[in-house]
Amino acid sequence: MPELPEVEVTRRSFASQIAGAQVLSVTLGKPLRWPLGRAPSSLVGARVQQVRRRGKYLLIDLDRGMLMVHLGMSGSLRFATQLPAALGPHEHFDMQTDRGTLRLHDPRRFGAVIATDGDDDPVARKLLDGLGMEPLDAHHFRWESFRDGLARSRTPIKP
């Protein structure tokens, strides 16, 4: 399963390339863990504003909504200027932009791509609200609070 650092590396690998890109088409392969939530054609014409990460979710902010991507157990994202037109047997989401194509490869299909109206969308809130603080955000995560939290607890970190 991709852990948080791998998800962050994935985000960094394509975030600057896709920011500002316009969505030309969206193609779905076999169903993933959750449905997209809207017609793929509704994303055509949208512009990618930025790519963020919250926990293990990649959040692709569009000028009209947001895509939430979870890589599941075996998923990976690839952004390239030239990919085969047809989806392979383990490729389940393809977003072609004017700068390249973002493709989800997930052999076990535990991943998900969900289209929402943004951070305040009920689906987004349900998935993101319980995630806790961001360990890679120095503004919110401080050594002192971590140490104090450990000192107050008698629960083993990993039994």
What is each residue range found by the language model?
Residues M1-D63, Q96, E144, D148:
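Extended, highly charged segments
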